[in-house]
Amino acid sequence: MGEPEPVVALTEDAPLSVYNPNYRSDNALIADGDSSPIGGDCCPAEAVAAAEEVATAALASEEIYEMHIKSCISSTTCGDHNNSIGVTSGLTVRAAECHPPSPEAVGIEDVVVVQTAATTNGPSDTVPASAAASVISDDNGCVPLLGSRLELENYDLESGCYYSESDNETASLFIQRVGRRQARRHRRRRVALTVAGVVLVAVLCAISGIVGAFLARVFQ
């Protein structure tokens, strides 16, 4: 094996840094194999000051980078920025590409999905025969669809028809059903008024007959 090359002492132009492999904690730069201090002008205080200066510059550059990112995010016209920010020791930190936040969705309406309750023919949901017979109507052939209690509750006792909200009922069928119900109401009203008029006429005729008989007997 060859002899190791002697280590040359650093000159004044060499940077003082804790990263220097020849730096020792005994206030000197010592060459390998030599215990005598070399370069007495070199002191650890200068090295520490240089290291602190580098750390301060790095911290300042990091703060500038964070400020740039925050300002870029807060701006709506940021776009793609690749600004280079200088850092000590010849290093360069490129700002990450920042994009403006996506605009909030405006004008979106909530869609409500209505699900129809499935009817079952189980023994618990079936209507008793007596209840079914009590609600069946033969007026205009309108017979309620009997099945579950929910369907029985939707049955309109006044019109005698089953009120269905299913998709099978079109607009024309709905209008026809409402028209039949209105016609039945008007017919019932006309019948009631006719009966009331007949009763009133009969009562007036009876009263007039009684009064006429009384006056005829008085003035004989």
Swiss-Prot record:
Question: A Gene Ontology CC term for this entry?
Answer: host cell smooth endoplasmic reticulum membrane
Tell me the organism.
Equine herpesvirus 4 (strain 1942) (EHV-4)
- The stretches that face the Virion surface side, renumbered to this chain, are 216-220
Which UniProt keywords are given for this protein, alphabetically ordered? Host cell membrane, Host endoplasmic reticulum, Host Golgi apparatus, Host membrane, Membrane, Phosphoprotein, Signal-anchor, Transmembrane, Transmembrane helix, Viral envelope protein, Virion
Return the motif ranges for Di-leucine internalization motif: 145-146
Stretches in topological domain Intravirion = 1-194
Homology family: Belongs to the alphaherpesvirinae envelope protein US9 family.
- What's the superkingdom here? Viruses
A Pfam family it matches: Herpes_US9
Single Gene Ontology BP annotation: intracellular transport of virus
Q: Which residues cross the membrane?
A: 195-215
Per UniProt, subcellular location reads as: Virion membrane; Host Golgi apparatus membrane; Host smooth endoplasmic reticulum membrane; Host cell membrane
Q: According to its UniProt record, where is this protein mainly located?
A: virion
Annotated spans, Acidic: 151-169
- Tell me what this protein is called: Envelope protein US9 homolog
Query: What function is annotated for this protein?
Result: Essential for the anterograde spread of the infection throughout the host nervous system. Together with the gE/gI heterodimer, US9 is involved in the sorting and transport of viral structural components toward axon tips.
**Where are residues bearing Phosphoserine located in the sequence?**
164, 166
According to Swiss-Prot or TrEMBL, what is its membrane topology? Single-pass type II membrane protein
User: What is known about its processing and modification?
Assistant: Phosphorylated on serines within the acidic cluster. Phosphorylation determines whether endocytosed viral US9 traffics to the trans-Golgi network or recycles to the cell membrane.
| The UniProt record lists the keyword Phosphoprotein | yes
